[in-house]
UniProtKB/Swiss-Prot annotation:
This is S-ribosylhomocysteine lyase. Binds 1 Fe cation per subunit. The keyword Iron applies. Its EC number is 4.4.1.21. The keyword Lyase applies. It comes from Lactobacillus gasseri (strain ATCC 33323 / DSM 20243 / BCRC 14619 / CIP 102991 / JCM 1131 / KCTC 3163 / NCIMB 11718 / NCTC 13722 / AM63). It comes from the Bacteria.
Length: 158
């Protein structure tokens, strides 16, 4: 079985919330895809409940797409502590952290239920498992701690 980078990471050494560049893959024609770890809560200390995480996922799909050129996908970790973000190109962790901060601020301050995409039986595979209340609470808590552009040293972005 191939090695998976995130399983090699010492989860006891990181200091969430943070943005971490996992890898940059280069295609045969030189195109690059960056994979980021958007860690919202401290591993093995907490986990975002599925309803809140699911709603944050649906909202980040649009909010990060609006803020990051080359956005491909943002998918939750099974451990429910954050997300993988895939983008074309090589944006800095600082730029990604600032975009994430802005997106979470919008969730916390502006988003209403009617703004959440993909919440019907036709548009979501588990449409009953959403919680905007939880998404707003978690966004508030994450923002209060600040989002670092370094996983090991707290370097909170403005």
């Amino acid at each position: 079985m191939g090695k998976v980078e995130s399983f090699e990471l010492d989860h006891t050494k990181v200091k969430a919330p943070y943005v971490r560049l996992i890898t940059v893959e280069e295609g045969k024609k030189g195109d690059k895809i960056s994979n980021f770890d958007l860690r919202l809560v401290q591993p093995n200390e907490n986990a975002i409940p599925t309803g809140g995480l699911h709603t944050i996922e649906h909202l980040l799909a649009g909010l990060l797409r609006d803020r990051i050129d080359g956005y491909i996908d943002c998918s939750p970790f099974g451990c429910r502590t954050g997300f993988h973000l895939l983008v074309w190109g090589t944006p800095s962790t600082t730029d990604v952290a600032k975009a994430l901060k802005e997106a979470l601020e919008e969730i916390r301050d502006k988003i209403q239920w009617e703004d959440v995409p993909g919440t019907t039986i036709k548009s979501c595979g588990n449409y009953r498992d959403h919680s905007l209340f939880s998404a707003k609470q978690w966004s508030r808590d994450i923002l209060e701690k600040g989002i670092s552009d370094d996983p090991f040293e707290r370097n909170v972005v403005e």
